[in-house]
Regions:
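The conserved SAM/SAH-binding core of class I Rossmann-like methyltransferase domains
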Residues: 10, 33-34
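Glycine-rich flavin
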Residues: 2-5, 21-28, 34-131
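Beta1/beta-strand and adjacent pyrophosphate-binding region of the FAD-binding site
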Residues: 1-13
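N-terminal Rossmann-fold NAD(P) dinucleotide-binding loop
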Residues: 16-17
């Protein structure tokens, strides 16, 4: 038998997850459906956060390459792109897991899949048996 919710938010990006958490805090039985497979939307998963992480690491690399000019000798500075990408992935994972933690803490039910309206009272989750 399908679960019943007071409200279901389709989309777990910055607008969706904040909305779902707040609705649950206000006492509504809340679900959130996200198709990406991890919460946070484009910004957190493939946009703003990963880009800023890589920009920050690149800036540090550039600074380190110029340390000698100000009297700091460190030897050869090399870029390890694999480690930079792992660091970026770690930053994204920490933040997406943080949103999942907030869902658990605030009792928001999280469904992975693509949500769409079946009718005015039912939502189908593609890739799931849940309605």
């Amino acid at each position: 038998m399908p679960e019943k919710f007071d409200v279901t938010v389709i989309g777990g990006g910055p607008g969706g997850y904040v909305c779902a958490i707040r609705l649950s805090q206000l006492g509504l039985k809340t679900a959130c459906i996200e198709s990406r497979g991890s919460l946070g939307g484009t910004c957190l998963n493939i946009g703003c956060i990963p880009s800023k992480s890589l920009l920050n690491l690149s800036e540090k690399f550039h600074s380190a390459k110029n340390f000698e000019k100000i009297g700091i000798e460190t030897g050869e500075i090399k870029l390890n792109l694999d480690k930079m990408m792992k660091n970026k992935d770690k930053a994204v994972t920490v933040l997406t897991k943080g949103v999942e933690f907030l869902f658990k803490k605030n009792k928001v039910t999280y469904f992975k899949g693509k949500g769409s309206f079946e009718n005015e009272n039912s939502i189908k989750i593609e890739g799931s048996e849940d309605t």
